[in-house]
Amino acid sequence: MSQASQAHDVTEATEQRLRVDLAACYRLVAHYGWDDLVFTHISARIPGDAHHFLINPYGMLFDEITASSLVKVDASGEKVAPSPYPINPAGFVIHSAIHDARPDVVCVLHVHTPQGVAVSAQKAGLLPISQQATVALASLGYHDYEGIALRDDEKPRLVNDLGRKTALVLRNHGLLTVGRSIADAFVAMFTLQRACEIQLLAQSGGVELVTVDPRIVSGVKSNVEAVTRGGGGALAWPGLLRRLERLDPSYKD
């Protein structure tokens, strides 16, 4: 086999692995109840090709998405492989902006969970009242609502608000996380979403809340790296895939 053929096979295998993981991510978002019919989106950069991405077929529910149904697009949002489905134009504006500005990011995950939107509408945003919140706050930004994300002129502001952070609260809109892998982006979202759920439960008690000392919050990032043994989302991801295998392995199709 020639070197060119070997390289082609490696590229195809890498893309297929990415497709399986991204389809798994969509199924997990649906499993945890974070989906919003067909109106949110998760994208992944194809390794070795900074200009091609995978994103959901617009019109498919997240629990229907499979590895083969994901749409491959270029930096302009044009399909580079046959697909009967379009892509969400708002999704492309958000995702293309981040992928273009952050070459370190492989995956961008965006949801409209009720808890996330509720916290995004609170002036104080995410409060340091739980361990989950301290983890999220270690790398969290905020982006003001500008309407449905269809305009390219919003991209610089979105990118600036994210900066080098891992997560973004989109005011009056939802939550967004990024990661060097699909696993990292998913686990970051799991933590942020859980922090929002805890905050709303705590606030519903109608009593004064105890907040974590800012000095503790500032040291959380190194603590997390120690707890995960530097593995990030990869520590939990295999178990999540095993869960999907038990529930419905068709995501790999």
Task: Identify the meaning behind each predicted range.
Residues 2-16, 21-25, 166-253:
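A conserved C-terminal secondary-structure "cap"
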Residues 3-5, 70, 142:
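N-terminal cap/leader regions of alpha/beta-hydrolase-fold enzymes
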Residues 12-15, 81-89, 139-149:
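Flexible, glycine/proline-enriched loop segments at strand-loop-helix junctions
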Residues 19-109, 116-127, 133:
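An anion-binding catalytic pocket shared by soluble metabolic enzymes
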Residues 44, 98, 112, 158, ...:
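Divalent metal-coordination and catalytic microenvironments
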Residues 49-51, 102-106, 131, 137-140, ...:
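Short coil/turn connectors at secondary-structure junctions
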Residues 114-156:
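Class I SAM-dependent methyltransferase SAM-binding "motif I" and its flanking Rossmann-like core
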Residues 141-177:
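A contiguous binding-surface segment within folded domains or other stable secondary-structure elements
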